[in-house]
Every structure is written in C-alpha cells, then in structure tokens.
Amino acid sequence: MSLLRRWFDPIRSTWYYDRPLREAQLPIDDGITVYLRLDDVYSYLAVQQLEQLEEILVDELKPLKIVISDQAAPPPNGMSVDIWQNYCLNDAKILALQHRFAYDDVPEMPSKEAIQQAHLILERTPLKDRDFLYLLEDVFHMLWNQQYGKLKMLYAMAKNYQMPPQDIQFRFESIPILTAYFAFGGREYQAVDDLLRLTRRLQQQKLLKSSPIFLINHIEWREHLITDAEELFEIQSLQPELDLYIALEDPISWLLVSYIKDELANLYNIHLQIHPLPYQGRDHFDWSLATRLSKRTDVEFTPFCRPDVKTAMIMAQVFFQLGKEAQEEALLDMLKLTWTKGKDLSYTPHLQPILDEYHIQTLKLTPEDIEQKLQDNAVHCEQLQQPNLPVMVLRIAGQQFVFNSLYRVWMIESIFSNILEQRYKQQAHDLDMEREQ
C-alpha cells in the first residue's frame, strides 16, 4: 500500500465522518424529476407513489417532472439481459408483498407491441398535472398486468389525438436508465429503495405540506420484527444459516457483517459463514453512502485505511489459514482494525496483533492457494446471479433465500416473520383437520 494512503486515509476519513452529514439545503430550482422506463418493473412500483408524493409537495416543487426513456442501461455485474430481467421481476414481487404495491401474481415482461402502444398513449394525451399522473399509473398497470385489451382501447383513441405542445411536466428521452430514480438537488435517489431517504430530505428542508406515509412496512435498521420470547425461541430452534459473500476491501462488508453479527445473529441464533471474494476494486467507494450506513446502523466507522489488492490478499491468507471456528472472529477483527482504527494490514507492525492473537507464526498458504480459494468462492457467488454485493444466502426450515446488498438486509427479519406465519397457519390447519376427524 502507498504511504500516501496509509498516512492520509485515517486523517481524511475522520474529518469526513465528523463533518455535518447533510448539506443544510439542496437547491430546489429544478424541482424533482422522476426517470422511468415503460419496460422497467421498478418504474411500475414507483408510479404508484407519485400521486401521493405530488399531493404533499409544496407548490415550489410542483409539478413533478416525468422523463420516460426508451433506452435501458447495461445490466449490472455482467449479468445477461434475461437473468437481470428475471431478477428484477422476482425482487419487485418481494417489494410489492412487503410494501403492498399492486403487482401481478405471475409477473412477466410486457410485450414490445404493448410498450409501443403505451408510448403513443402518453405521448398524445392532453392530460396535465394530477390527471396525467393518474393516467401514467393506469397505463403502467395495464402494461404490467397484461391488460392488453384496455390498452388497445386507449391506443385506438390516442391515435386520433394531435401531438400536444411540449410540456414541462413530461417528456420522452433516449438516455440509458437502469432502474427508476428521482433526481433532486443534483442527487439521485433510487425510486423504491431511496424513497424514504428522499422524503426525509424534503421534510428536513420543509418542502412537504404534511408528513409522508410511504412504504408502511419498511423495517428500519436496529428495529426487530420479532420480540415475543416464544417466537424468538422458535426461530432460534430452527438454527438459521446465513452465507455472506463479501469483498474484503469494501467498507459495506465491515458495516453489514458487524451489524448482522451484533444485531441479528446473536438474537436469532444465526450461524454465519463468510466467503471472501477476490479483489473487486471496491476500495473506491461512495464515502457518503458508507457514512450514512454507519450512522443508521450505529456501527463504528473511521478512521479507516482503505485496503488495496495486496492488503486484501493478506487478509485472505490469515482467514484461510485458520479453522472455520476462528475464521469469522479473525475476519471481524481485521475489518475492525482496517475500518475503525486506520490500520494498514499489509504493514507488518499493524498485522502483528492479529497474528499473535490467533497464534499464527507464518502465513503458510501460497498466493496461488489463496487465489484458488477466492476464485472458488467467486464461482459460487456468480452462480447465485445477484447484481450487487454482499450476496446473502439464508437457509431456514428447509427453504433457501438469496438476496444482496445493504438494501435487502431487512429481508432476514421479514423471512423469519413469514416463516412463523406459515408455521402457525399450518398448525391451525392441522388442528382443524384433527377436529373434523
């Protein structure tokens, strides 16, 4: 690691963390713009929130500006288009069930013909303001619920309309969009995952006329769904297992592993298994995102010294040299030194306390051995077909659930709650059957 990073990262990171997290005011001159795609399932979820959001905005931010793009950005993480679309459909179904969005029981991508018809309907409509938002939601609903008969009726009517004059509220553009997002004050907010962050910002700047009520079943960090002692015991007795595929150089790995260990694993008796991946280049990360996550999870962060390729390899060497029972604790210790003490573990004096604590005299495994183990983990992770890291695999009650990233950690508790509900329903059903006999 360069001396520049070793010496200046701890200083810079401490200063960054201690400064005020939020700018006092974001500019409102450009209002709020919502970027959508007709063939993006997250856009379908987003439009179901727009009328309610517009209703509580102050007049200075009205109307919401809508941009619909006909161009999809390349799928993330090298995923194929088909795999990415399938992932999005399944992920959106999970979000819809959690937050009570309207959503088809058997979701599928809308046809190209239907998308073209929806495009013309929106392009030719004379509707404005809230009436336009109602139409927008209806059109998306027809698209994503295969109500093609209704769509064709609107299409037949729209063909007879003249093209309306250009409207500041709505336009089509050909710009690459991966998934729906809001743009406000020079920042981007994912349309579903960052909606509450956006409304908190708007509320802070007194840009809402009333309190927002969105995503009513959202599970906050450090909030637990299961607090009843009997229910806790039932989940604990199922001995859930959680596999985590992480990049060693990523601060999100430290923040989430520490959070899951302290807040969830101990509470629910989750057996953790950590699988380090080859270097992913994630030492070049969004400092503001990591800082926000640290403060919301209450996990210690900074001063840090970002690991590079060499440091990640040394951490992996220590990890794989230990038995499975010691790997998790050793990795947490190394991550803690890196992300809360500003230690450079490629520098022997900084690494030595770890070697001493775990009685490691020499690092015996060769770089080739380590690379092979990391690559094996990477192959397994790739087979799970997830767009972001960390990738999480939860096994409980004979079922397996795969999800990813800081935006889906809440699923752990949601799954536990659903498992209990399923078991209680089954027990009630069995009891009814016994009574009938």
Indicate residue ranges for each PLM-predicted region.
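A eukaryotic "domain-start" boundary segment
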Residues: 11-13, 17, 22
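Active-site beta-loop-alpha junctions enriched in small/polar residues
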Residues: 39, 249, 277
